[in-house]
Design a protein with these regions (language model features):
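Extracellular and secretory-pathway beta-repeat/beta-biased strand scaffolds
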Residues: 8, 19-21, 26, 30-568
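An N-terminal, helix-rich hydrophobic module
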Residues: 2, 6-8, 12-19
Length: 568
């Protein structure tokens, strides 16, 4: 691609008397007797990702250290689609006025540099809010924004050398897409928001400031996308999307408009900040969320949040997700990947006044929904919480924690009916191969029927066993090789106070579909315990529920009462 051919070379910066700023030139070019400045003459922006990322991070850390000598706004703009005028007459302010290409709703500008220091501003004035201005940096100079970038229309900013939105910066547009993946000349001229690796490795995309897309989506595209704790990214009438990948095609609005290819674990998305929108999506090879996500509107995707990784997808620390719909019902949250989980004090909440929403961690019910990829490992920490309650009048929602391999559930799930009416919800915590259950599920309903908890492992033993629970420490997940799932009698007794329980084993994976009751279970809540085994049920201890229902259904091996086993 001719416009990016120069990116295969090294550049240094020299002072340009005509422009009154530092510009990037080929490394063997003469400085022309320009102004001496030790702070800038020796600066080189190689296209190696590590060096470029270090320089970009340094620029962010120093708060744009070149402000004393560089023009305080983007430079060297040339319109390649439509028309653009560049007004530098106001101090520390650039006004760009665009006209769309004939018969289109977009314009495109190639820039030598696109950075805004603190105290400076750039305004891109477009024909209307539905217009789009594509801005590509065609040198090796990274973009660092510490001032204000605003537009009445949608902005696309592309810089393969890296993009940083520093702390204190404000990006205020109708919609905003930033990418460190390349956009080809052909795509720019056609107005296609399609991005891909083009030769050398792209830089990182880092946000520490505020980004708002008032009438559209905010989409951040790079192999590495990082949102700092100080960052706030908002799309009150659209979606906020972090897409860490090698090829990303933005074909339309919302989460359904994103198509990407990722490489795990190299393509990483990290969110420590606050993401707010109709919908929120994080797509990566590896993703970590420990900030705040709020999807509380309903114009595009209706309170929907998707965290999807080809590798690990974890909500950590005090990370939280809240999803509700404008119609008073709970939203929908999916956390999907090869290994998924909530650690520390992480939480997901789809509770709402008219009924709880849906939470899927690692898969959908029974792991059989082809549209929802299944995890191999799911882990819910002891202080982690998932809630899909009806807070006033309505039914509790649906919560699933699933893994084709191992699930360890130590946390808390609530899917309660409303205080003014409604029934409890439906919860499943299952590991197709192995399940460790040591948490608590609440599906009670103050003025309705208690809901249900489904446990769906290959085999399960109820008893005081030395079988160790799975652990997650330092990113290392450890679990025993034994295929049996486990629950203690006290866990079942406690759980039956707040849910009906169904234990349904299968002969999948390494298990044979058996249920072993090795130590007695008693309860007095009146809730139902149902044991359903593909193979056999082995009663080695009594089961007793005062005023309750015990139902058992065995497969080919039948029900075996080994002496002390009774049901009452």
């Amino acid at each position: 691609m001719s416009s990016r051919a120069s990116l295969n070379h090294f550049y240094r910066t020299v002072w340009n008397h005509t422009l009154g700023c530092a510009v990037a030139v080929a490394e063997n070019a003469s400085s022309g007797g320009g102004r001496a400045s030790g702070a800038i003459q020796s600066v080189v922006f190689p296209h190696q990702p590590v060096a470029r990322l270090a320089l970009l991070s340094l620029a962010v850390a120093l708060g744009w250290g070149f402000t004393g000598i560089a023009r305080a706004n983007p430079t060297g703009g040339v319109a390649v689609v439509g028309q653009a005028t560049f007004d530098y007459t106001q101090p520390n302010h650039l006004l760009v006025t665009t006209q769309n290409g004939a018969g289109t709703n977009y314009s495109a500008i190639n820039w030598q540099s696109f950075s805004i220091p603190s105290g400076s501003s750039t305004r891109i004035q477009q024909p209307n809010a539905s217009s789009m201005s594509i801005n590509r940096v065609v040198t090796n100079t990274p973009t660092t924004l510490f001032g204000t970038l605003s537009s009445n229309g949608k902005i696309v900013l592309v810089n393969q050398s890296g993009i940083a939105v520093g702390q204190g910066a404000v990006v205020d547009t109708a919609g905003f897409t930033a990418s460190t993946l390349a956009m080809s000349d052909a795509d720019a001229r056609a107005g296609r928001t399609r991005f891909a690796v083009d030769g050398a490795a792209p830089g990182a995309l880092n946000v520490q400031g505020q980004v708002i897309g008032r009438n559209g989506d905010v989409v951040l595209v790079a192999p590495s996308v990082e949102v700092a704790q100080s960052a706030v990214i908002e799309a009150p009438n659209g979606a906020v999307i972090l897409a860490a990948g090698q090829n990303v095609d933005v074909t339309g609005r919302g989460l359904e408009g994103i198509r990407l290819n990722v490489q795990a674990p190299q393509d990483q998305a990290l969110n420590l900040g606050t993401l707010k929108g109709d919908a929120v999506g994080i797509f990566a090879g590896t993703l970590k969320h420990s900030g705040a996500i709020n999807a509380t509107q309903a114009s595009v995707d209706g309170g929907r949040v998707v965290l999807k990784a080809s590798g690990d997808a974890f909500i950590e620390g005090n990370g939280r997700i809240v999803a509700t719909r404008a119609d008073g019902l709970g939203g929908a949250v999916q956390v999907l990947g090869n290994r998924v989980g909530l650690t520390d004090n992480a939480s997901i909440d789809t509770s709402a006044v008219g009924g709880g929403g849906t939470i899927l961690v690692g898969g959908d019910a029974h792991g059989t929904n082809p549209a929802v990829p299944n995890a191999q490992v799911a882990y819910i920490d002891a202080n982690a919480r998932l809630a899909a309650d009806a807070t006033e009048k309505g039914d509790g929602g649906k919560v699933v924690v699933w893994a084709d391999g191992v699930t360890q559930f130590n946390g808390k799930i609530s899917a309660k009916g409303g205080a003014q009416g409604g029934n409890g919800g439906w919860v499943e915590t299952s590991g197709k191969r192995t399940l460790g259950f040591a948490g608590l599920v609440d599906t009670t309903a103050a003025k309705g029927s208690t809901g249900s908890l489904l446990l769906d492992p290959s085999d399960i033993t109820i008893g005081f066993t030395n079988w160790p629970v799975a652990t997650l420490s330092g990113g290392v997940f450890t679990f025993p090789s034994d295929a049996n799932g486990t629950m203690t009698p006290s866990t079942i007794t406690t759980q039956l106070a707040s849910s009906n329980i169904t234990i349904d084993t299968t002969s999948a994976m390494a298990g044979s579909g058996d249920i072993y009751v090795n130590n007695g279970v008693t309860w007095a809540s009146g809730n139902t315990l149902k044991l359903k085994a593909t193979s056999g049920i082995y009663l080695n201890a009594p089961i007793s529920g005062a005023g309750a229902t015990v139902a058992m259904q065995a497969g080919s091996a039948g029900i075996t009462n080994n002496g002390p086993g009774t049901v009452s």
